[in-house]
C-alpha cells in the first residue's frame, strides 16, 4: 500500500509540474510582444475604420546620446472598427499587448460622428487600462499626429506625457481617462467632454 501511495504522490507531482510548465510556456517573452503605448482611431477612405497602434522603440542606435526613442507603428483598416481590430494580427510580427496603453487618440472626423463604437471596442478588451487618457486630434487624423511626432528622436507617448505635466499652464481643460469617459457617456445628465490636441506647424 505504501508503494502505491508513493507512486500516486509522484504521479500527482508530475501532473502539477506539467501544468506549471504549460503556464510558463503560455507566457510570451518581452521581445515577442508588441506593447502598445498609443492607440489611434481614424476614419479611412470610403467610410472604413483605421487603427494605428504604436509602441516605443527602445533600440539605442549608435552614439549613445543620439539614441533613438521613436515609435514603431502598425496600421490596420476594416469596414468597421471591429474588422480593423481583427485585421491587426495579420500585420503584426509579435503578439499585441494593450495592457500598457497610456493614450487613446481620435481623429476629428471620428469625434464628429461619434466615438461610442470605439469606446465600446476598447471597453470590451480585457487588457485596456481604464486610466488611459483620451484626446481628440483637432483638424487632423490621429495617425498623422503620430507620424509627425515620430519623425524626431522623441517618442509620441513621451511628448504627450510632457504636455500633461504642464497641463495647468498650457491647457484650458483637464484630462479625461477612459473610465471617466465611459461614465460620462453612461450618464444622461452629464455633457460629453473629451479634450483635444491641436497640432501647430513648426
Describe each PLM feature range:
Residues 2-202:
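Membrane-proximal alpha-helical signals and transmembrane carboxylates
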Amino acid at each position: 500500500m505504501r508503494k502505491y501511495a508513493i507512486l500516486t504522490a509522484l504521479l500527482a507531482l508530475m501532473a502539477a509540474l506539467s501544468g506549471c510548465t504549460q503556464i510558463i510556456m503560455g507566457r510570451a517573452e518581452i521581445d515577442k510582444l508588441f506593447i502598445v503605448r498609443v492607440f489611434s482611431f481614424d476614419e479611412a477612405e470610403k467610410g472604413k475604420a483605421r487603427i494605428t497602434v504604436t509602441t516605443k522603440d527602445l533600440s539605442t542606435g549608435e552614439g549613445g546620446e543620439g539614441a533613438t526613442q521613436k515609435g514603431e507603428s502598425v496600421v490596420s483598416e476594416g469596414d468597421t472598427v471591429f474588422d480593423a481590430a481583427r485585421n491587426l494580427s495579420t500585420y503584426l510580427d509579435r503578439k499585441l499587448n494593450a495592457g500598457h496603453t497610456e493614450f487613446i487618440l481620435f481623429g476629428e472626423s471620428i469625434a464628429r460622428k461619434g466615438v461610442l463604437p470605439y469606446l465600446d471596442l476598447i471597453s470590451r478588451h480585457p487588457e485596456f487600462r481604464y486610466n488611459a487618457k483620451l484626446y481628440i486630434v483637432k483638424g487632423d487624423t490621429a495617425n498623422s499626429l503620430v507620424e509627425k511626432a515620430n519623425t524626431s528622436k522623441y517618442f509620441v507617448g513621451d511628448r504627450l506625457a510632457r504636455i500633461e505635466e504642464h497641463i495647468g499652464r498650457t491647457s484650458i481643460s483637464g484630462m479625461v481617462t477612459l473610465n471617466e469617459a465611459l461614465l460620462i457617456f453612461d450618464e444622461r445628465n452629464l455633457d460629453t467632454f473629451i479634450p483635444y490636441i491641436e497640432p501647430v506647424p513648426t
